[in-house]
Amino acid sequence: MRLVLTGAEGTMARTLLSVVPAHHDVVPLSRAELDIGDHHRVMRTLVPLHPDAVVNLAAMTRVDDCEDERDEAYRSNTLGPHHLALAARACGAALLHVSTDYVFDGMKESPYDELDRPNPISVYGRSKLGGEEMVRRHTPEHFVVRTGWIFGGGPDHLSRQVALMRSGEPGAGLFDRVGSPTYVRHVAERLLPLLLTERFGTYHLAGPEVESWFDVLTRIRFLAGLPVMVERQLVQDLDLRAPRPVNSALTSLFAADLGLELPPLDVALKEFLDGQD
C-alpha cells in the first residue's frame, strides 16, 4: 500500500512512521512540502503520487492560538481537509482524517460515543468539526478518527511534569476537566489496521479511562514510586483563552467491534515511563 502522510513533522506522524511495516510505501509530507490550505498545491502534489490512502495529520492544534488566529485555524482545520478530500477522490484514494474530542461541548456526564451529536465550544473545536464535515461530504471512502488527550512521542506537558517530579519538585495537573488520556503510540499502531478494513466511517480511538491530568500524574507518582506530591490546578487559575469542555472523554464503540480498542491507562503509562528513562 502506498500511503501519503501529511503533517509529517508532528508527533503522531513521527510515531506512525515508526510503526508502519517496511513493505508499505509511505510518502511523508511536512507543512513545508505540502500546505494543505492551498488547494492547487494539494492537487498538484497528491494526484501524481497515486496513493492508495492519504492520512491527514496536518492541523493547527494549539487550542488557545486558534482563538487569536481564527482565519488560520479554519484554513488549516477546515479548508485543508476539504482540499485533501477532493484530491483523494480524484485519485481514488481513501482518506483517513484525524480529528479531536473537542468537537463536543462537555455537557454529557458519560463518555461520548461515535453517534453523539457534536457541539464544539471553541474555535479549535468548530474548525475541526468543519474539517470532519468536509471529509464526509466530498469523499465516500473516508475514515474520521477522533482521539483523546494525546501524550507521549516527544516533549509535551506530561513529560515535562514527569521530569519535574523526578527532580524532586511537585507536579501539577488540571483537576476540573476530564477526558481520555491516550498514548500516541497506541493510536498510531491502529491507524493502518483500521485503513485496511475498508469499513469507512467515524471512529473514536482513545484511552478507555476517564481521568483528569491530576489523576494521570497521581497514577504516575505511584507507578514510578516518586516521593513527591501532585498539586491540583483549576481552569480559572490558568491563562487559557479558549474554553475547554468539562468532559471530553470518548468511548470507542465501533473500534471495539473491529478489535482495535486501546489498552488500559496503566499499560500506556508504563510504556510511556519506560520511554522516559
Residue locations for each model-derived region?
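NAD(P)H-binding glycine-rich loop region in Rossmannoid oxidoreductase-like domains
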Residues: H39-S76, R89
